[in-house]
Amino acid sequence: MEKTLATSHTKRSSPPSPSSAVNTSSTGFNRRTRQRLSDATASVSETDVEDEDEDEEGVEEKIEALQTIVPGGTELGVDALFEETASYILALQCQINAIKVLTTFLERCEKKDMKFGG
């Protein structure tokens, strides 16, 4: 299947183009390629679904754990649980700061040998 290019001065031969060298209808190239792509897409889709299921299970487990940690969390929906969690964290931070202040105060009192109560 060699093509000949004719010009006014010379005659040249060019190699066959890749598309003409492979007869896609007789070799079934397109059909096999489409099948492999389809199989690859199907396996990726199955993997994606499995990953999503695992992700959902992981999220549900974490929400259940959060419900047990936050006071009253078992009676709350997810949105309210997140809001309550944020409030709970702020309350815990305030308690930590109060304990730090009390600790500092008591350490100073011990250094001065101050006595309480009487």
Curated annotation (Swiss-Prot):
**Which family does the similarity line name?**
Belongs to the bHLH protein family.
Task: Tell me the first and last residues of the signal peptide.
Answer: none
Transcription as UniProt keyword: yes
InterPro entries in alphabetical order: bHLH_AtIBH1-like (IPR044549), IBH1-like (IPR044660)
What are the GO cellular component annotations? nucleus
Please give the chief subcellular localization of this protein: nucleus
**What organism does the record attribute this protein to?**
Arabidopsis thaliana
Gene encoding the protein: PAR2
Segments of this protein annotated with the region Disordered: 1-59
Localization (cell): Nucleus
The protein's name is Transcription factor PAR2
Q: Per UniProt, which keywords does this protein have?
A: Brassinosteroid signaling pathway, Growth regulation, Nucleus, Repressor, Transcription, Transcription regulation
Give the protein's function: Atypical bHLH transcription factor that acts as a negative regulator of a variety of shade avoidance syndrome (SAS) responses, including seedling elongation and photosynthetic pigment accumulation. Acts as a direct transcriptional repressor of two auxin-responsive genes, SAUR15 and SAUR68. May function in integrating shade and hormone transcriptional networks in response to light and auxin changes.
Quaternary organization: Homodimer.
Q: Its Gene Ontology biological processes?
A: brassinosteroid mediated signaling pathway; circadian rhythm; developmental process; regulation of DNA-templated transcription; shade avoidance
Locate the compositionally biased regions of type Acidic residues. Answer: 47-59
Q: Explain the consequences of disrupting this gene.
A: Slight increase in the length of hypocotyls, cotyledons and primary leaves.
Q: Where is the composition biased (Polar residues)?
A: 19-30
Q: In the UniProt entry for this protein, what further remark is given in the free-text comments?
A: Plants overexpressing PAR1 are dwarf with compact rosettes and inflorescences, epinastic leaves, shorter flowering stems and siliques and a general dark-green phenotype.
Segments forming domain bHLH: 43-92
